[in-house]
Amino acid sequence: MPGFDYKFLEKPKRRLLCPLCGKPMREPVQVSTCGHRFCDTCLQEFLSEGVFKCPEDQLPLDYAKIYPDPELEVQVLGLPIRCIHSEEGCRWSGPLRHLQGHLNTCSFNVIPCPNRCPMKLSRRDLPAHLQHDCPKRRLKCEFCGCDFSGEAYESHEGMCPQESVYCENKCGARMMRRLLAQHATSECPKRTQPCTYCTKEFVFDTIQSHQYQCPRLPVACPNQCGVGTVAREDLPGHLKDSCNTALVLCPFKDSGCKHRCPKLAMARHVEESVKPHLAMMCALVSRQRQELQELRRELEELSVGSDGVLIWKIGSYGRRLQEAKAKPNLECFSPAFYTHKYGYKLQVSAFLNGNGSGEGTHLSLYIRVLPGAFDNLLEWPFARRVTFSLLDQSDPGLAKPQHVTETFHPDPNWKNFQKPGTWRGSLDESSLGFGYPKFISHQDIRKRNYVRDDAVFIRAAVELPRKILS
């Protein structure tokens, strides 16, 4: 090794320094022929290169003339130095010869762990390492008393069968770990256990109450039909479909039959009651027919207009006109409409080929009063002004429409305008209209766009009443 590389309290004298490494000489030797001194290691390295001359004066060297210099070594070892760990905090200083003795006790000196673990650390950190960190340290378990190395103790810790622990199911019980498995499977009130019937898992202290309500709990048929037991959730289906002794209603119950008997006897009842059941079915059909008629009537009432204005489209005009020419007095009827809400119910009729004085030459229009739902609340006879219009379908942007319009005031003495049902008896109501046999001629109806796309539009408007009788 080259010379000493330490922190000297005083600068070493030059004669103590090795000419080769420039440091205070370690194990100095002297060349007796010239008197020069060197570190033994430095001189050996110099000569190993094949140069056998003194490094200082270049005179030939002879190994036999190189001797140790103990006096110089005493002087070098007496030089005062600081500890090599002074920068880390060690305050020791003393002769160089005492350094090794100091390092044997210096708390800052790095030494290997005495337990022969791979760690090297300062002497002052050794106690904590030996107590807490060293994998080779010896530890005794506080629960079972066994001795372990640090590595083995880490595996043992938290697994010791003698350690006192709480139940993992949080039932509050505390016991040695070795008893925990038996407790969890057979003693713990919070352990899970499958239901005997439905196989779902429940906490042990609730499974008893569950089993009394379990849908798969076997129960006996209350009718004692002899099938043994069925699951509770299947019992309604059993009573309804499978139990031969269950009381059932007659399949004609919706028709009015109230008979009830065991399922086994129901077939006999049905066979013996064909005529009564048929009578019930006929009565039911009759009631349903009446209800259907009433619903249709109510639906028709809802679809009837109630603002006193009717716009009636007569489609397929050409075909229907030809039919009217082939069948004299063929009459077309409009949908019914009300003069207002809770008002008079009216209907317009048309003879496309005319009737009476207009037959064969004109379009005839009439209006008649129909029996309405509110007739008892209205003034009679009907006396509201009525206006008929045949609408001109010409484009309003090209020409002003020229509707054909006629207005009349009903004659209060005319029977057609009396309250319906008070006088008509069995008369044919289709002949009771009032209007115009010659509303417009066939010749005039073709002059403008009164017929367009094979359809005509007829408008009927009724003057709104001023009051309803209370």
Curated annotation (Swiss-Prot):
It is found in: Cytoplasm; Nucleus; Cytoplasm, Perinuclear region; Cell junction, Tight junction. Its EC number is 2.3.2.27. SMART domains: MATH, RING. Changing residue 18 to A: Complete loss of E3 ligase activity. Gene3D superfamilies: Apoptosis, Tumor Necrosis Factor Receptor Associated Protein 2, Chain A (2.60.210.10), Zinc/RING finger domain, C3HC4 (zinc finger) (3.30.40.10). Residues 307-462 form the MATH domain. Pfam families: TRAF-mep_MATH (PF21355), zf-C3HC4 (PF00097), zf-TRAF (PF02176). Induction: Up-regulated by bacterial lipopolysaccharides (LPS) and by single-stranded CpG oligodeoxynucleotide. A zinc finger (RING-type) spans 18-58. There is a cross-link at residue 263 (Glycyl lysine isopeptide (Lys-Gly) (interchain with G-Cter in ubiquitin)). GO terms for biological process: apoptotic process; cell surface receptor signaling pathway; innate immune response; positive regulation of JNK cascade; positive regulation of protein kinase activity; proteasome-mediated ubiquitin-dependent protein catabolic process; regulation of apoptotic process; regulation of canonical NF-kappaB signal transduction. Residues 277-309 form a coiled coil. It is a peripheral membrane protein. GO terms for cellular component: bicellular tight junction; cytoplasm; cytoskeleton; cytosol; fibrillar center; nucleoplasm; nucleus; perinuclear region of cytoplasm. PROSITE patterns: MATH, ZF_RING_1, ZF_RING_2, ZF_TRAF. Pathway: Protein degradation; proteasomal ubiquitin-dependent pathway. The modification Phosphoserine is found at residue 426. It catalyses: S-ubiquitinyl-[E2 ubiquitin-conjugating enzyme]-L-cysteine + [acceptor protein]-L-lysine = [E2 ubiquitin-conjugating enzyme]-L-cysteine + N(6)-ubiquitinyl-[acceptor protein]-L-lysine. Polyubiquitinated, leading to its proteasomal degradation. Ubiquitinated at Lys-263 by the SCF(FBXL2) complex, leading to its degradation by the proteasome. Belongs to the TNF receptor-associated factor family. B subfamily. The coiled coil domain mediates homo- and hetero-oligomerization. PANTHER family: TNF RECEPTOR ASSOCIATED FACTOR, TNF RECEPTOR-ASSOCIATED FACTOR 4. This is TNF receptor-associated factor 4. It comes from Homo sapiens.
